[in-house]
Amino acid sequence: MKIAGIDEAGRGPVIGPMVIAAVVVDENSLPKLEELKVRDSKKLTPKRREKLFNEILGVLDDYVILELPPDVIGSREGTLNEFEVENFAKALNSLKVKPDVIYADAADVDEERFARELGERLNFEAEVVAKHKADDIFPVVSAASILAKVTRDRAVEKLKEEYGEIGSGYPSDPRTRAFLENYYREHGEFPPIVRKGWKTLKKIAEKVESEKKAEERQATLDRYFRKV
């Protein structure tokens, strides 16, 4: 029997791609994944994730990594959950080795609904099990999580080569916010690596525009008093 796991990395960032990884392994090879001690990618160091990446590939029967650029995410129709279900299905439908059972990390608060909606979009028959924190429960989902996270990390590193320090890309990262504020202040717009429509961008733009107006008012006052 063939078992699949699927997970994403980069759902919440304002910068960079979302990456979805779907993996397939024979049930007889599951102990090999367990021997690698795969687990939720967020609980592993970048160095450990990189090492596991190639080791995981050696155990798999098949895998697909889908990289969704920020412009596609920002211009999507529907909710982020719907977008994720559609692209989970796209990744799974692209597998050459079709699984009999799929374990997925549920993006929906309703696990059964997520499993049902994912199953309805598949072009093959398979049992779908969706759980919250599936990457902590099922090694096959942990493996998918690691492939997705490493791929996103590599993409972010490439962006840093072009744009400098952008942080992790998450709105809560002060480095990311500083980069976006400075870029908007200098260019009057955000770089093409952001996800348009994110509330963070609106807040930053409003903050910078407010600061510019305050600076202009102060400059006007300074000129007036110099004349006086």
Curated annotation (Swiss-Prot):
The keyword Metal-binding applies. Manganese or magnesium. Binds 1 divalent metal ion per monomer in the absence of substrate. May bind a second metal ion after substrate binding. Changing E8A: Reduces activity by 99%. Its cofactor is Mn(2+); Mg(2+). Keywords: Cobalt, Cytoplasm, Endonuclease, Hydrolase, Magnesium, Metal-binding, Nuclease. A divalent metal cation binds at D7, E8, D105. SUPFAM superfamilies: Ribonuclease H-like. Changing D135A: Reduces activity by 98%. It is an enzyme of class 3 (hydrolase). Monomer. Belongs to the RNase HII family. This is Ribonuclease HII.
